[in-house]
Design a protein with these regions (language model features):
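Single transmembrane alpha-helix segments in multi-pass membrane proteins
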Residues: 9-58, 62, 66, 71-92, ...
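Helix-loop-helix "hairpin" substructures at the membrane interface of multi-pass membrane proteins
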Residues: 145-223, 246-251
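Short loop segments and helix-boundary regions at transmembrane helix junctions
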Residues: 33-37, 78-133, 229-230, 234-247, ...
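Transmembrane alpha-helical segments in multi-pass inner-membrane proteins
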Residues: 208, 219-282
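Transmembrane helix-bundle core of multi-pass membrane transporters
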Residues: 102-169, 270-277
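Hydrophobic core segments of alpha-helical transmembrane domains in multi-pass membrane transport
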Residues: 24-25, 49-53, 103-107, 153-166, ...
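Cytosolic-side transmembrane-helix boundaries in multi-pass membrane proteins
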Residues: 181-195, 266-302
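Loop-to-transmembrane alpha-helix initiation sites
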Residues: 92-93, 119-123, 150-154, 197, ...
Length: 302
């Protein structure tokens, strides 16, 4: 088993499994910074996954599919903005309702668009291409894992850098953090909390859209009902463990990706029942949130 964990293929697959979780964690990070809980990241990823798959298939273009997937994620977040910011509904309950809506909407979209097919729970897609960097991809152990990856991996690295710059070096970043931590002070100097939160939710939706697109347009090459499988919630947990810091959040998302792949790959390496291995990502989420809550309460009580 140790040889398997230390192998190059293990690292390649860990990163592949972590990418949608990382995008989900970035979506959670930016919304939480603005002071709004986007619990519907899971649903946004599902709608983005089916939209990206279908549009890329019919347009025969992964780029158009990717843009439409991001747009679908943004649309889901605008529904949250309408409910929570305009109509003053509870953002958590609104998010749960939108997740439930997304589950049925995805199947309805597939059945409506691909009517007459035998299997109406899946939709084909055009794959986002892989990027192979000459020479660097031949570096032992890390070469294929980092320098021979799907294009969305490199987009994820760019998003990480942009998030760091946005939150620490721009006026918008200051406004987003002000909307989340000191919105009364922001309002007093003319910063609209609602407008800032809407902008944050647009960014959040784009991130969720990229995560959903990866699942249907890079990981599998088709949309399948239930393919998000809790990764949106796991991304939220990774962001909670990372305490709103982009690099730490990415590292925790990678950890969850490792556990996720271990649950799948371990079925052929270990003799444990696969049902037990499939519970590992969710047990890890519960443990992570428990540790985070304990640490947060300890800090609050000091």
């Amino acid at each position: 088993m140790l040889d398997w964990i230390l192998s190059e293929s293990f690292l390649v697959n860990v990163i592949a499994y972590a990418i949608p979780i990382i995008f989900a964690s970035y979506a959670s990070l930016i919304s939480n910074k603005a002071g709004i809980s986007a619990i519907n990241i899971e649903g946004a990823m599902s709608v983005a996954a089916v939209t990206g798959a279908l549009v890329s298939h019919f347009a025969n273009s992964w780029a158009i599919g990717l843009i439409c997937a991001m747009s679908a994620g943004i649309l889901m977040m605008m529904l949250l903005a309408l409910s929570a910011l305009k109509l003053k509904a509870d953002s958590f309950l609104s998010g749960i309702a939108l997740n439930t809506f997304a589950t049925g909407a995805c199947l309805l979209i597939v059945k409506g668009v691909l009517e007459g097919r035998t299997d109406s729970s899946t939709a084909p897609s055009v794959l986002v291409p892989n990027v192979n960097i000459p020479f660097l991809k031949d570096i032992p152990v890390i070469g294929k894992a980092i320098f021979s990856q799907n294009l969305l991996f490199f987009i994820m690295l760019a998003v990480l850098a942009l998030l760091i710059v946005l939150l620490n070096c721009t006026r918008l970043g200051v406004q987003i953090k002000t909307a989340g931590y000191h919105h009364e002070a922001g309002e007093s100097v003319g910063v609209s909390t609602r407008k800032t939160r809407v902008i944050a939710l647009i960014i959040c939706g784009a991130m969720a859209g990229l995560g959903g697109a990866y699942l249907s347009m890079a990981n599998l090459g088709y949309f399948s009902a239930g393919m998000v499988s809790g990764r949106g919630f796991i991304g939220i947990a990774a962001e909670a463990m990372g305490a709103g810091m982009p690099v730490k959040t990415t590292l925790f998302a990678l950890l969850f990706g490792a556990v996720d792949y271990f649950a799948v790959g371990g079925q052929t390496v270990l003799s444990f029942p696969y049902e037990l291995l499939n519970t590992l990502p969710y047990l890890m989420t519960l443990l992570a949130l428990t540790i985070y809550a304990a640490a947060h309460n300890k800090k609050t009580n000091k």
